[in-house]
Amino acid sequence: MLKRLSIAILAALVLLLALPAYADGAAAAEQSTVLSEKYAGYSHFIVIDKSRNRLFYYQKGELVKSFAVATGKKPSYTPEGLFVIREKIKNRPYYKGKIKGGDPKNPLGDRWLGLKVTLKDGTTSYAYGIHGTNNEKSIGKYVSEGCIRMHNKSVRWLFDQVEVDTPVLIQK
């Protein structure tokens, strides 16, 4: 009898301790489904949440899909702020490593959504992008030099949805 009571009390305690975590997760998920009114007027909009390594794609203010991504090795590597997609390229070469576009060794995969990023010092950079990968196991981790990596299948889908000038909000 005492053993059953102890098990029941233990189960109740575990449930009570788990509820706040579940509620926080549910609230965070719900928060991500609706785009802030400030940005809801855009036909396409991307939010990248570095704290969860997730990309959220919105159309007309409604969440369409979310994806796991990889972001910077250090928090400062992936810039934060409101940017725009400036170019869409299939099979972009990896200039740093002198690897041709379409090569399986290319760490950018076969799709590149290049961002126009205003850096903290006020200069503009076109070196950051949302792209595929040659290392699918890296997705969900903090491993990049600053770009946003996606599974190749996911970035192909996103590439077909977005247009040049689509806003991209990158946040903690």
Tell what function each PLM region has.
Residues 48-50, 87, 141:
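Conserved strand-loop elements at the edges of beta-sheets that form or border functional pockets
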Residues 1-9:
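Bacterial N-terminal signal peptides that target proteins for export
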Residues 32-74:
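A structural motif detector for short, solvent-exposed N-terminal "entry" segments of globular domains
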Residues 8-18:
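Bacterial N-terminal signal peptides
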Residues 19-23:
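Sec/Tat signal peptide C-region and signal peptidase I cleavage site
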Residues 25-28, 34-41, 73-80, 89-172:
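Exported/periplasmic cell-wall-interacting domains
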